[in-house]
UniProtKB/Swiss-Prot annotation:
NCBIfam families: PRK13192.1, PRK13207.1, urease_alph, urease_beta, urease_gam
Pfam name, any one: Urease_alpha
Protein name in the entry: Urease
Residues the record lists as binding Ni(2+) 1: H404, H406, K487, D630
Length: 835
């Protein structure tokens, strides 16, 4: 079998699974519907009785809207399949595959030998659920029009194609440089281009005359490229010379008689805002629904320029001499530009181009050619050495950071990366009993080995050593060997003596201390543990307590200025299934036995509906600052991001708008609060926010691109150090990259170690220890971990006065009871995933 046949076999398996689900009355999600139709088309091709055209039609009537979830009607626009016909391999494209109400289940189940279910199993939903405004990722565009470059003068000009073939001219092409068979007054076109939307074109048919409007080029007004007729800086005094020369070369020129000229210039080109959003993505004051959540964001500002958007493609803007600068060295130009992205970050929700150089973000704003465009940002020059990632109608966030990782298996890295995580911070050595329970890499040999073994993986890595030692020599040795933090865990004994010793060493070496406190209350209650902190900064893991910690009141620590609190994701958010799964998780992770009553009591003491409910609200208030996974040790490494947004959705559902969003009709403040929980705040906490954690100039270019409809669930692309490390990719044998099956695959950027970072202690670098390991990743020291506090947690610095009833478990914050009901349905769930 060829590799492509294995990929098609995966498609067939999912298509077959979708058929079985359909036969028992399950309405299919987008992935299931796509796979069913695609795999059935493959089977029809195998019969050898149908042409490409036949199958393009047949694929449109298999499933009706009654057979799929309502959102599929708007999300499934086309399916592309390549299959082997009797005469070879050909592409079949199914446009609008869900375009009927009832479909044809005989076609959908052909060859499966499954019984055809009754249509009564698939009642239509309420009509409002099929409305576009209820679809995931819906963009609500402000009414009105957008004027393009309104301050520029317009010059109308008559143009006739004297050739025998059509001529199409793009928006930013220097009009004087156009085809020799276009006849017009070239003197009027000197230093000008078409007044049309960026990336569009005007087509001149043979013999046809059109009147078009021209506008002056901007920037340095340096003309390059084209036919080199007017090369150089625009100089009106050169017009006659340039026209004479081009006429000698055979280019047509027809001076316009003043009597034939229009009496006045035309008004600026106007684009309806809805069309603008389709072409370039939403702009200022447009609203976007995030995935299928109830969260709505408003674009606060657009840093691109209407009429000068940088657009790549055939006949579009980013071409030599137009949107791409000529004759500039690599040092002067971006390595990669991401164009027209909606950025969601703690710094704002806005639209901009993002410039990348040497793996770092060097510019955010307007990118392009300063020779011909105004307002090009510093360090934002697009040249022949610049690659382009088009992000129109996409969201860009910074790569997520999971700050609670048990490195139990290397496959976690692949799973985390595919969810949008680009930094994993924690400890472990593989599936040892110690690592299954704790995040500790406890000695130099294992630290060296873990740094080297993760060196080739496309993930930033930071390791934590074992901090449970009331002495200091081993703790120091672990930091000097490369650990970027120390972890205190109750399974190793989180006693006041160990806490004091660990924090003292962390203070000395400027690394973070992390703690899983004492559920047993063996040495002290929570008050004793807090006293042992001595007001020193510490990251308290799973501060609610189900993941471990003083029962029942570890959650009270969120009131203190030196506590940097986080949640782990099994309790995010509180649902009707949360409590029932926790006990078995806990027993496995912490090497407990159901045959030992004390083990069972220990486990049960950690699981409390009251504190989990309180955790929801404290996250929404910004009293708990971070969300992480606790990977394979009571947590899911691929769900940090999705469960963060589920928590935000549930809180909006039950608590309404936050005061800061009240009356705005959008959730910008809430979204900034939640995105900070897995980006900037864990980066600040662990001393790496000078390098990662936010979409800002100077940060390492770990960026995640999302389709609006898939936000929070499934990235379309992940960049590591400015290079694509993961993307949604079709059949590698396909004639185009969008042929089914589309899967998240690691790309070339995943195989360059220098696109990722190993975060280590400064001591391990200055001593030369890290250099001796021979790592290929970039190496960076953590810093400024000991002089921070809750006040530094962006959008998440609230410190309410906390109480917890030791018997009823009732939690209050600033005198208010923190209670909410569990939910039985959440977004970013069965609409997106197969299993």
């Amino acid at each position: 079998m060829q590799p492509r046949e294995l990929h098609k076999l995966t498609l067939h398996q999912l298509g077959s699974l979708a058929q079985k689900r359909l036969c028992r009355g399950v309405k299919l999600n987008k992935l299931e519907a796509t796979s069913l139709i695609a795999s059935q088309i493959q089977e029809y091709v195998r019969d050898g009785n149908h042409s490409v055209a036949d199958l393009m039609s047949l694929g449109k009537d298999m499933l009706g809207k009654r057979h799929v979830q309502p959102n599929v009607v708007h999300l499934l626009h086309e399916i592309m399949i390549e299959a082997t016909f009797p005469d070879g391999t050909y592409l079949i494209t199914i446009h609008d595959p869900i375009c009927t109400t009832d479909g044809n289940l005989e076609h959908a189940l052909y060859g499966s030998f499954l019984p055809t279910p009754s249509q009564e199993l698939f009642p239509l939903e309420e009509e409002k659920l099929y409305a576009p405004e209820n679809s995931p990722g819906f963009v609500e565009v402000l009414e009105g029009e957008i004027e393009l470059l309104p301050n520029l003068p317009r010059t109308p000009i008559e143009v006739r194609n004297m050739g025998d073939r059509p001529i199409q001219v793009g928006s930013h092409y220097h009009f004087i440089e156009t085809n020799e068979k276009l006849c017009f007054d070239r003197s009027k076109a000197y230093g000008k281009r078409l007044d049309i939307p960026s990336g569009t074109a005007i087509r001149f048919e043979p013999g046809v005359m059109k009147i078009v409007n021209l506008i002056p080029i901007g920037g340095a007004k340096l003309i390059q490229g084209g036919n080199s007729l007017s090369k150089g800086v625009f100089d009106d005094s050169r017009t006659r010379e340039i026209v004479d020369n081009l006429m000698k070369q055979g280019f047509m020129h027809q001076p316009e008689s003043p009597l034939n000229m229009p009496l006045q210039s035309a008004r600026p080109f106007v684009v309806p805002r809805k069309l603008y959003a389709v072409m370039y993505g939403p702009t200022t004051n447009d609203k976007i629904r995030l995935g299928d959540t109830n969260l709505i964001v408003r674009v606060e500002k657009d840093f691109t320029e209407y009429g000068n958007e940088s657009v790549f493609g055939g006949g579009k803007v980013i071409r030599d001499g137009t949107g791409q600068s000529s004759s500039k060295s690599m040092d002067e130009c971006l390595d990669t530009v991401i164009t027209n992205a909606v950025i969601i970050d703690h710094t704002g929700i806005y639209k901009a181009d993002i410039g990348i150089k040497n793996g770092y973000i060097v510019g955010i704003g307007k990118a392009g050619n300063p020779d011909t465009m105004d307002n090009i940002g510093e360090n934002m020059v697009i040249g022949s050495s610049t690659d382009v990632i088009s992000a129109e109608n996409k969201i860009v966030t910074y790569g997520g950071m999971d700050s609670h990782v048990h490195f139990i298996c290397p496959q976690q890295i692949e799973e985390a990366l595919a969810s949008g995580i680009t930094t994993m911070y924690g400890g472990g050595t593989g599936p040892s009993t110690g690592t299954n329970a704790t995040t500790c890499t406890p000695n130099k040999d294992l630290i060296r080995s873990m740094l080297r073994s993760t060196d080739s993986y496309p993930m930033n890595i930071g390791l934590t050593g074992k901090g449970n030692d009331s002495g200091s020599s081993s703790l120091k040795e672990q930091i000097e060997a490369g650990c970027s933090g120390l972890k205190l865990h109750e399974d190793w004994g989180s006693t006041p003596a160990a806490i004091d010793s660990c924090l003292s060493v962390c203070d000395e070496y400027d690394v973070q201390c992390l703690i899983h406190t004492d559920t047993l209350n063996e040495s002290s209650f929570v008050e004793g543990t807090f006293k042992a902190f001595k007001n020193r900064t510490i990251h308290t893991y799973h501060v609610e307590g189900a993941g471990g910690g003083h029962a029942p009141d570890i959650i009270s620590l969120v009131q203190n200025p030196n506590i940097l609190p986080s949640s782990t994701n099994p309790t995010r958010p509180f649902t009707t299934n949360t409590l029932d799964e926790e006990l078995d998780m806990l027993m496995v992770c912490h090497h407990l036995s159901r045959n030992v009553p004390e083990d069972v009591a220990f486990a049960e003491s950690r699981i409390r509906a009251e504190t989990i409910a309180a955790e929801d609200i404290l996250q929404d208030l910004g009293a708990i600052s971070m969300i992480s996974s606790d990977s394979q040790a009571m947590g899911r490494c691929g769900e940090v991001i999705s469960r963060t947004w589920k928590t935000a959705h549930k809180n909006k559902l039950q608590r309404g708008a936050l005061p800061e969003d009240e009356g705005s009709g959008v959730d910008n403040f809430r979204v900034k609060r939640y995105v900070s929980k897995y980006t900037i705040n864990p980066a600040i906490t662990h001393g790496i926010s000078h390098i990662v954690g936010s979409v800002e100039i100077g940060k390492f270019a770990d960026l995640v691109l999302w389709d609006f409809a898939d936000f929070g669930a499934r990235p379309s692309m992940v960049l590591k150090g400015g290079m694509i490390a993961l993307a949604s990719m079709g059949d590698p044998n396909g004639s185009i990259p969008t042929v089914s099956p589309l899967m998240s695959w690691q790309m070339f950027g995943a195989h360059d170690p220098e696109r990722s970072i190993a975060f280590v202690s400064k001591a391990s670098i200055t001593s030369g220890v890290i250099e001796s390991y021979g790592l290929h990743k970039r190496v960076e020291a953590v810093k400024s971990t000991r002089n921070i506090g809750k006040k530094d947690m962006v959008y998440n610095s609230y410190m309410p006065k906390m109480t917890v009833d030791p018997e009823a478990y009732t939690v209050t914050a600033d005198g208010k009871v923190m209670e909410c009901e569990p939910v039985d349905k959440l977004p970013l769930s069965q609409s997106y995933f197969i299993f």
